[in-house]
């Protein structure tokens, strides 16, 4: 069975955006292509168990096994060597992407303390949106008593839209709660 947001996109969001922006073809309507989640851990080179825990927790959150990211260069000031594992990342596409977005918008973000909406200034000018969360414990899959370290997660929402306005409308139609929404 297809993800709930995928069917919502096909049945509701595409006609709505097509009407709003007056595209010539239905293929010009912006769509979400992938979501990339990245965790960078500074203490990963001194505490490898923290990185393993982050990999396991990111796998729980996304339903997909993350890949460890390695240092490209040695930096003596930070005591890291080339090839050391410093974080992990996962790229979500298809049903995994829509399921994660559904859980993020409807379950995780409302659990953030004093949440007023996400910032709408995270667009890069090409229709991609970047945001981060400060703690991984907002996801219900993470058991608070089992975690050792808190870390943030950077998220990039990659769309095929040409402008920030189109991407903002797309993500808002998916239910992303923006702070300064009109």
From Swiss-Prot:
The keyword Ribosomal protein is assigned to this record: yes
Cleaved signal peptide residues: none
GO biological process, one term: translation
Pfam families: Ribosomal_L5, Ribosomal_L5_C
Kinase found in the keyword field: no
GO MF term set: rRNA binding; structural constituent of ribosome; tRNA binding
Keywords, in A-Z order: Ribonucleoprotein, Ribosomal protein, RNA-binding, rRNA-binding, tRNA-binding
One Gene Ontology term, aspect cellular component: ribonucleoprotein complex
Record note on quaternary structure: Part of the 50S ribosomal subunit; part of the 5S rRNA/L5/L18/L25 subcomplex. Contacts the 5S rRNA and the P site tRNA. Forms a bridge to the 30S subunit in the 70S ribosome.
Family under the similarity heading: Belongs to the universal ribosomal protein uL5 family.
Function: This is one of the proteins that bind and probably mediate the attachment of the 5S RNA into the large ribosomal subunit, where it forms part of the central protuberance. In the 70S ribosome it contacts protein S13 of the 30S subunit (bridge B1b), connecting the 2 subunits; this bridge is implicated in subunit movement. Contacts the P site tRNA; the 5S rRNA and some of its associated proteins might help stabilize positioning of ribosome-bound tRNAs.
Entry protein name: Large ribosomal subunit protein uL5
Organism: Leptospira borgpetersenii serovar Hardjo-bovis (strain JB197)
Designated gene of the protein: rplE
């Amino acid at each position: 069975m297809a993800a709930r947001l995928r069917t919502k996109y096909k049945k509701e969001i595409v006609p709505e955006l097509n009407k709003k922006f007056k595209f010539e073809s239905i293929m010009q309507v912006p769509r979400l292509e992938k979501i990339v989640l990245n965790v960078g851990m500074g203490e990963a080179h001194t505490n490898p168990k923290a990185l393993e825990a982050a990999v396991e927790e990111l796998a729980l959150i996304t339903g997909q096994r993350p890949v460890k990211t390695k240092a490209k260069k040695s930096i003596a000031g930070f005591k890291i060597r080339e090839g050391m594992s410093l974080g992990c990342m996962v790229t979500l596409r298809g049903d995994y992407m829509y399921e994660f977005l559904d859980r993020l918008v409807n379950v995780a973000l409302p659990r953030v303390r004093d949440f007023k909406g996400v910032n709408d200034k995270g667009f890069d000018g090409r229709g991609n949106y970047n945001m981060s969360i400060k703690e991984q414990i907002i996801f219900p899959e993470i058991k608070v008593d089992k975690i050792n370290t808190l870390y943030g997660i950077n998220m990039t929402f990659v769309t095929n839209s040409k402008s920030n306005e189109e991407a903002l409308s797309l993500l808002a139609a998916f239910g992303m709660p923006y702070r300064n929404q009109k």
